[in-house]
Regions:
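Tandem repeat scaffolds
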Residues: 3-214
């Protein structure tokens, strides 16, 4: 189902500068701004409180990367591998993840606003305790993702795989899941109140009631 929510897009300069040494920019200056980074592997980048503003990452592989408390603004990740990256306790605003791998990525305890995940492989992604507002998750695989105690406000799940995902203590009120695969989703009955599901999904969710339908 198409989203009725307006998600702001990242804002960039018309021309972005190529990065000479991303480690110097982030580790020594704690800031990366108005840059484009392409076709690189970034190894073992660990920093806390980094600001990344108005940047584009294309075809980047992040290995052993931890940027907790990151301030991520007006940035696009395209065809990147962010598997197991740690962006926990960060602020993620006007950011796009396009055709990215997010296997086991940590975005827990984040403030996530005006963000689009499109065609991403995000099995085991962790979004626990985050606040998500004006977010689109479009044609993504978030199998066995963890959404524990997440505050969802105007979050659109479209044609995405949520098989065996964990939504403990996360209200799904007004959340439309009709185009998604939610088989085996782990959620409390009280948090399903107001959720929008199709008839087949509703039948599957009766397992939470411990009843038998003949």
């Amino acid at each position: 189902m198409a989203s009725n929510y307006k998600v702001q897009k990242p804002k960039f300069l018309e021309e972005l500068e190529e990065v000479i040494d991303i480690y110097d920019e982030i580790l020594d200056r704690d800031k990366l701004q108005n840059k484009i980074i392409e076709n690189e592997t970034i190894e073992g980048l660990v920093n806390k409180g980094t600001t990344i503003d108005s940047c584009v990452f294309k075809n980047i592989v992040f290995n052993g990367t931890s940027l907790r408390n990151v301030d991520l603004l007006d940035t696009r990740f395209e065809n990147c591998d962010l598997s197991n990256i740690d962006l926990g306790d960060g602020s993620i605003h006007r950011v796009e993840f396009i055709n990215c791998k997010l296997l086991g990525a940590r975005l827990d305890e984040c403030n996530i606003r005006d963000v689009r995940f499109s065609n991403c492989l995000g099995k085991y992604i962790n979004l626990s305790y985050s606040k998500m507002k004006n977010v689109i998750i479009d044609e993504c695989d978030f199998t066995e993702g963890t959404f524990q105690q997440v505050k969802l406000d105007k979050v659109n799940f479209n044609k995405s795989n949520l098989i065996n995902s964990f939504f403990n203590k996360t209200s799904l009120n007004k959340i439309d899941l009709t185009t998604c695969d939610i088989n085996g989703i782990d959620v409390e009955i009280s948090d399903l109140s107001g959720a929008i599901v199709n008839s087949m999904q509703g039948l599957d969710l009766t397992r939470l009631l411990n009843i038998v339908i003949k």
